[in-house]
Amino acid sequence: MFKGSIVALITPMDIKGNICKKSLKKLVKYHIKNKTNAIISVGTTGESATLNKNEHTNVIMHTLEYADEKIPIIAGTGSNATSESILLTKKLELSGISGCLNITPYYNKPTQEGLYLHFKSISESTDLPQILYNVPHRTGCDLLPQTIAKLAKFKNIIGLKDASGDLSRVNQIKSLVNKNFILISGDDTTALDFIQLGGNGVISVTANIAARHISKICKLALAGNFYKARKINEKLKILHNLLFKETNPIPIKWAAKYIGLIETDKIRLPMTQLLDKNKKNLKKIINLLQLNKNKFL
């Protein structure tokens, strides 16, 4: 169902820190124009942790409105409280979203049995397609391949976003799940290798400002043309790394503002503005790639 370049969309804000609908609309149109395959609305990159419940829902609904059924919208509905995740999922059931991205519960560090029961409960509460999301370095818990295999038996748990950084897991998980289970990289720096090992695409931070590049890389890679895909990807390596010099989404919001996609790089505390030295380096690579001119290399 989902493959290729899926953007982990930033949530633009105005100078007062309120949601900027004008910039959000511009972002959505940018991804439609540049052939992004789907949008993640209000995931980690979308600052889900610092949006209140009404804002969370409103951003998703506005994203759907601006997408106008021209691009699938996947809603970030994860929580470290199972009941909260179920509540948000059910609230969005008739909204028109194409699926949900569910992060592993953060901070409370559940056991593998707890993780299994958490995702099982969410799955059984809805018919919406569910994508599991494993990002151990941010959550403090790791969804292991054996647990993923158990969860893959639920018909609406259709895939996994793997941001573990462990490429050896791709084949391990593939050997444990059915052939239709989707494996999506959550790490721009290793995404091409992930696809070459049998993955289906990437949920990308870099795509926020280099949508056509990431789309082309994924299209080539999924067609088996890794030589051409690597030629493009090599040009983005420095950019990938610079976008994670500080905690995501600090650098990507500044970069999106720099190239004119959003009006401000406002970000909510406890996240802070990008350091000047990192702005300088990002500006240099953005100019080199001509992303500020919206050109495709």
From Swiss-Prot:
Annotated CDD domains: DHDPS (cd00950)
One MF term in the entry's GO annotations: 4-hydroxy-tetrahydrodipicolinate synthase activity
Major place of residence: cytoplasm
The UniProt record lists the keyword Lyase: yes
Coiled-coil parts of chain: none
Subcellular location: Cytoplasm
Catalytic residues of the enzyme: 133, 161
Binding residues annotated for pyruvate, in chain numbering: 45, 203
Site note Part of a proton relay during catalysis, residues: 44, 107
Known EC number: 4.3.3.7
Key word Cell membrane present: no
Biological role stated in the UniProt entry: Catalyzes the condensation of (S)-aspartate-beta-semialdehyde [(S)-ASA] and pyruvate to 4-hydroxy-tetrahydrodipicolinate (HTPA).
Subunit structure: Homotetramer; dimer of dimers.
Family as reported in the entry's similarity comment: Belongs to the DapA family.
Name of the protein this chain belongs to: 4-hydroxy-tetrahydrodipicolinate synthase
Organism: Buchnera aphidicola subsp. Cinara cedri (strain Cc)
Gene name as annotated: dapA
